């Protein structure tokens, strides 16, 4: 049968459930769709056609239109990392707007299980080794509502943990950026993280939350000075 239904006897949690689904999958691609989201009838066909056009790509993702050219557009690992870490960002999206080549997902080891930031971690792991395809927007609909996992992460400040993942990726031997680009990317991330922490502590008056994040991301009080430096 083309469609099979598998039920978990217990709630496995977000990422363990996705890993189990990937283990059951037999197809060339993985397409996750959370129960509160929607993919339009043409969406899957567009995603698959784009991935077939670029067989060396591990990840396809819906992105806003770009003046640089039409989609689908394929990016090298270096170009993808440069756009995310030195440009306006690239990997800040969830699985609803993504399609993954199954072989690459398995070679990368699947999701680590880090709550809230596991998607981002997987995207940069894939992008370090394989090409990435930009897809047009409008293929899916992502619903926001109270009680969903995304809102839980926002309210618990869990998404700040993406800083540690980004810093590890920039320091990894597999990072496709040059040494000069890595240095600039690290400076940018540190400055933004420092500004986020100060905003949380001062403007939002969440001192304890800011301190917990600083400890978890090994960001020392003196490191906050980087928030006042000019952009690299």
Where on the chain are the PLM-derived regions?
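Acidic donor-binding segment of Leloir-type glycosyltransferases
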Residues: 1-7
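Glycine-rich, basic loop-to-helix element that forms the pyrophosphate-binding segment
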Residues: 7-25
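Short glycine/serine/threonine-enriched helix-capping/active-site loop
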Residues: 8, 57-64, 135, 142
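Short aromatic/hydrophobic "clamp" motif used to bind/position activated sugar donors
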Residues: 30
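The conserved acidic donor/metal-binding loop of glycosyltransferases
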Residues: 34-38
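Conserved donor NDP-sugar-binding/catalytic core segment of glycosyltransferases
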Residues: 42-73
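Conserved nucleotide-sugar donor-binding catalytic segment
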Residues: 77-163
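C-terminal subregions of glycosyltransferases and related glycan-biosynthesis enzymes
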Residues: 121, 144-232
């Amino acid at each position: 049968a083309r469609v099979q239904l598998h039920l978990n006897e217990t709630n496995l949690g977000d990422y363990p459930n996705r890993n189990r689904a990937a283990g059951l999958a037999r197809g060339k691609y993985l397409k996750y769709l959370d129960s509160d989201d929607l993919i339009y009838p043409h969406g899957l066909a567009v995603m698959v056609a784009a991935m077939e056009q670029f067989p060396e790509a591990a990840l396809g993702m819906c992105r806003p239109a770009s003046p640089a050219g039409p989609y689908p557009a394929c990016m090298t690992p270096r170009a993808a990392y440069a756009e995310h870490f030195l440009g306006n960002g690239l990997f800040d999206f969830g699985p609803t707007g993504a399609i993954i080549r199954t072989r690459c997902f398995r070679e990368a080891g699947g999701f680590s299980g880090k709550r809230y930031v596991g998607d981002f971690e997987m995207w940069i792991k894939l992008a370090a080794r394989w090409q990435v395809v930009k897809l047009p927007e409008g293929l899916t609909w992502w619903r926001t509502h109270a009680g969903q996992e995304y809102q839980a992460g926002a309210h618990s400040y869990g998404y700040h943990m993406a800083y540690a993942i980004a810093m590890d990726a920039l320091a990894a031997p597999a990072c496709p950026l040059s040494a000069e680009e890595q240095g600039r990317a690290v400076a940018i991330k540190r400055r933004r993280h420092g500004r986020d922490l100060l905003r949380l502590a001062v403007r939002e008056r969440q001192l304890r939350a800011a301190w917990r994040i600083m400890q978890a991301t090994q960001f020392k009080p003196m490191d906050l000075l980087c928030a006042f430096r000019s952009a690299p």
